[in-house]
């Protein structure tokens, strides 16, 4: 699909259903080729900058492995690895990196930052995560659901439970609308997505034969789901009072066996973008337990470790789908 050549990947809302389907099909093809040893490098002699204002395990590893598999060279610029925002404007950084690199990945805070990089760099820019959006994650989520459920995308009933305002919830709603899915967002009313985004997604869903439901009624929201999805409730760096208020709001929305059973679907699967606070076995998890008495946050360990959980297949698919995005926008077919 030549019209993806040299395009940036900033938000799924920039892409048509046909284009998203193309990226997902290409992901399947590249994954198959890697598994059977027939992968052909289509990014040979390309130089890629990975610009991270936020640390990451999956996003960094996915981009680096995908790039190396495809023959590209990678430079990682971590939170202290560039002058962007400190001694140099985003606009200037974009023009500097655009003169040296063939593509730029950005993972950080503001959606406006990744948009500025795309506007001024002159090369494809890929959104690895912002506070508002997480489009590469959604490609992996959808691919995993199709692989496990053996259903067409439009036939998947996809439900997100938790903080309806966060970047993953936003991106999933966008993607589901584009793909014509039946999408439910189950969250407290105080954490509903913005009206602007919701109305836009509802219009897109209607055009594609899909449906979007926003509800705080857990029973109504999860009934008939093929996928139950959640994400962490809090982010590092937020004030204590924000954590306390949000934890109280979201306690009833913890994904546990009861919620999985309420779907009425014995084949329902559980997805999560990771990392997850499903126990107190991490430094942050222990701090949360000591301060708030919560040992399991957004999902119980029982569900996380159950046969319904596909989170590690989903994590692997970050690499295959990110590879597809880079190949489609930068590769030599």
Swiss-Prot record:
NCBIfam families found in the cross-reference section: orni_carb_tr, PRK00779.1, PRK04284.1
> Example GO molecular function term?
amino acid binding
Biological source species: Staphylococcus aureus (strain Newman)
Question: What family does the database annotate?
Answer: Belongs to the aspartate/ornithine carbamoyltransferase superfamily. OTCase family.
Please give the InterPro entries that the UniProt record associates with this protein: Asp/Orn_carbamoyltranf_P-bd (IPR006132), Asp/Orn_carbamoylTrfase (IPR006130), Asp/Orn_carbamoylTrfase_sf (IPR036901), Asp_carbamoyltransf_Asp/Orn-bd (IPR006131), Orn/put_carbamltrans (IPR002292), OTCase_ArgI (IPR024904)
Which residues are L-ornithine-binding?
Answer: 167, 231, 235-236
Q: Report the top EC class in one word.
A: transferase
Q: Which domain of life is it from?
A: Bacteria
Catalytically driven reaction(s): carbamoyl phosphate + L-ornithine = L-citrulline + phosphate + H(+)
Q: Alphabetically, which GO biological process terms does the record hold?
A: arginine biosynthetic process via ornithine; citrulline biosynthetic process; L-arginine biosynthetic process
What is the name listed in the Swiss-Prot or TrEMBL entry for this protein? Ornithine carbamoyltransferase
The annotated pathway is: Amino-acid biosynthesis; L-arginine biosynthesis; L-arginine from L-ornithine and carbamoyl phosphate: step 1/3
HAMAP family listed in its UniProt record = OTCase
Matching entries from Pfam families are given as:
OTCace, OTCace_N
Residues given in the record as carbamoyl phosphate binding sites: 56-59, 83, 107, 134-137, 273-274, 318
Enzyme Commission identifier(s): 2.1.3.3
Q: Where in the cell is it found?
A: Cytoplasm
What the protein does comes down to:
Reversibly catalyzes the transfer of the carbamoyl group from carbamoyl phosphate (CP) to the N(epsilon) atom of ornithine (ORN) to produce L-citrulline.
- Principal cellular location given in the protein's record: cytoplasm
Entry keyword set: Amino-acid biosynthesis, Arginine biosynthesis, Cytoplasm, Transferase
Give the record's GO CC terms: cytoplasm
